[in-house]
């Protein structure tokens, strides 16, 4: 998505205006594989939008009805909104770039997609990191004075941290516009013949990319890894303590702790894969139509969907609401026919 094609050694390349786009790069994938990738992406987008829409609707309804919402619910609302917007944007971008390349290549349209994509991805990374941080502070069993003071103040800090993340993400997305430029060379010689072929070359602003990598991706990634790992260790230690005190492996409390450990581990793996795929995709390491680039897109689309399905399964309130929704959807056609 970040690659713009510029003929080398032209003013367009330097000014980043009135871009003269190259023809689309030749795809190295078969039509069947391209169709399969598009189908997988579409399914992931729809699952992510439905799952995040459900989470957002439940907590937003609670917010409106009770004039208040839990801190974790507030974070989930922010996270769900960012993911719905991101999944919708990615689905819209694929549709427009596939059906109307000339319109998609216009500067205003291209940069609108580019800035929105980076902004929503960074928001999603930060919100998920704050969710992990909040659970760590509330659940982990540590007795350090600083940790206890943080636990007492975390509820009041979270709203400010969420809006600060929005500001950081927006500022950083504006800064990252000109990190990478991709242009084509139409006269690359083929030594085995007298013909030439088109190649796509990239120029990367290394300083900008380093800043982009550290602030936009690595900072929330490190925070998520540290808090999730410490929370897993705390839960594991507490579970071992409960086991040594006797109650047996079928104790509901112990099963709940083990379920929490598995869920957090699952979140951690998804988050790391998504962050790595996002960095590779944004830095244009591979050709835009290569298998690796498409694999990064699949991972990025799978993360919001997979990361949202598990809370619905593990959270009793969300699980009950989901079952009620399924029951209503099942009964509605029967009532309509009557």
Swiss-Prot record:
SUPFAM superfamilies: Family A G protein-coupled receptor-like. It is found in: Membrane. Glycans are attached at residues 185, 194. Its main location: membrane. It is a multi-pass membrane protein. Receptor that may play a role in the perception of bitterness and is gustducin-linked. May play a role in sensing the chemical composition of the gastrointestinal content. The activity of this receptor may stimulate alpha gustducin, mediate PLC-beta-2 activation and lead to the gating of TRPM5. This is Taste receptor type 2 member 39. It comes from Pan troglodytes.
């Amino acid at each position: 998505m970040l690659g713009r094609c510029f003929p080398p050694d032209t003013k367009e390349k330097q000014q980043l205006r009135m871009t003269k786009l190259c023809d689309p790069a030749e795809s190295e994938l078969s039509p069947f594989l391209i169709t399969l990738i598009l189908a997988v992406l579409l399914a992931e987008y729809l699952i992510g939008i439905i799952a995040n829409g459900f989470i957002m609707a439940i907590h937003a309804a609670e917010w409106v009805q009770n004039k208040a919402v839990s801190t974790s619910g507030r974070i989930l609302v922010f996270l769900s909104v960012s993911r719905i917007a991101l999944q919708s944007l990615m689905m819209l971008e694929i549709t427009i770039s596939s059906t109307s390349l000339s319109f998609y290549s216009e500067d205003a349209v291209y940069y609108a997609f580019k800035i929105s994509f980076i902004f929503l991805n960074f928001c999603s990374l930060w919100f998920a990191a704050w969710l992990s941080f909040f659970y760590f502070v509330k659940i982990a069993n540590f007795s350090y004075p600083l940790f206890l003071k943080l636990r007492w103040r975390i509820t009041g800090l979270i709203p400010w941290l969420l809006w600060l993340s929005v500001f950081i993400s927006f500022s950083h997305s504006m800064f990252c516009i000109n990190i990478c430029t991709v242009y084509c060379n139409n006269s690359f010689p083929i030594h085995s013949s007298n013909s030439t072929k088109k190649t796509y070359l990239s120029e990367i602003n290394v300083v900008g990319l380093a800043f982009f990598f550290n602030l936009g991706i690595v900072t929330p990634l490190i925070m998520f890894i540290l808090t999730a790992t410490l929370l897993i260790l705390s839960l594991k230690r507490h579970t071992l303590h409960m086991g040594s005190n006797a109650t047996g492996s079928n104790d509901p409390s112990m099963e709940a702790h083990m379920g929490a450990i598995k869920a957090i581990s699952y979140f951690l793996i998804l988050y790391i894969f998504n962050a790595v795929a996002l960095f590779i995709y944004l830095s244009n390491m591979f050709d835009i139509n290569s298998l690796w680039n498409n694999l990064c897109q699949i991972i990025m689309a799978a993360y919001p969907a997979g990361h949202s399905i598990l809370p619905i399964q593990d959270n009793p309130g969300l699980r009950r609401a989901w079952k009620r929704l399924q029951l209503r959807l099942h009964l509605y056609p029967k009532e309509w026919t009557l």
